[in-house]
Amino acid sequence: MLNALLLTVLSALAVGESQSVKVDDRTDVKITLRKDGMQVNWDCAESNMKYVREYYKSNKFRWDFYKGETLDCYLSPHSGAKSKVVAYPAYRIMANPGNYFFRAFLAVSRPNTAVRHSITLKDDGWQAEWFFPFASLETFDFRKNSKKNTTFQPGVNWAFKFSRRSQTTGKTVVTQSPVVVVSIPAEVIDPYRQVLFASLNSDKKGNGVIISAALRNTSAKEFTGKVKFYLHSGKDIKVVATQNVRLPAKGAFRVSSPVDLPELAVKFNVHLEVVDQEDRPVRISADIPIENPWVDF
């Protein structure tokens, strides 16, 4: 249970500074504050890399995070100043040496193009790098059964809990870190706290969709910028519409745009970016899967 994880490490970071975390004698994690997001680096020693390489080359369960080698992290960017736990609402992030990556919020998988991840295999172990842009953080309760119109504002205290699962010795071993709470300067996170998504929807229209979103301004200052609508056609991603946005202080604004789908045998997704007057992304939505009207995947 998340609420049973006790705080043992509290660290204040400036931009460019890192907090090291030891999961066990084979596993080290480094949390680094960047000016636009949080970076997590794993360094995993492994004496049986031959087994690891073969497993993720040929095993049919190589995508399964509950088998093989797995890095696991619970993360809450919404922890209070006195938080002693990785508390609701939390993310769960998992990865393995096959470069399979999983990210869930409120226990629901929500891929986001802005979140970056990579894996490096070495002779004596493997490494993982994750980057979570502040602009990509989830800001509303998107679950269909939710009865609350809740928005989540990222805070200055981020709580982490790390664990590693390994079976290269022939038996499953799971080790975990203490809870780590990282405090970041308010001026770093504030530009990404002003504009929140309060909703995000897609509706079919012919061979395309209408994408709509509700924006909320949490600040006593007006926000002026743009919303960019991105279409993913397979691996190709491009801006298909742009709208000017003027959010009054503590006010709301709705945007919508039709998105036409090209006749291609690919999977489609759409995501939105809110950018300020300097064209800096301050809010990036999760990827919205769109049904292909020509091909059934």
Language-model regions, residue ranges each:
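Structural preference for beta-rich elements and adjacent junctions enriched in aromatics
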Residues: V9-G234, T242-F297
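Sec-dependent signal peptide recognition
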Residues: M1-T8
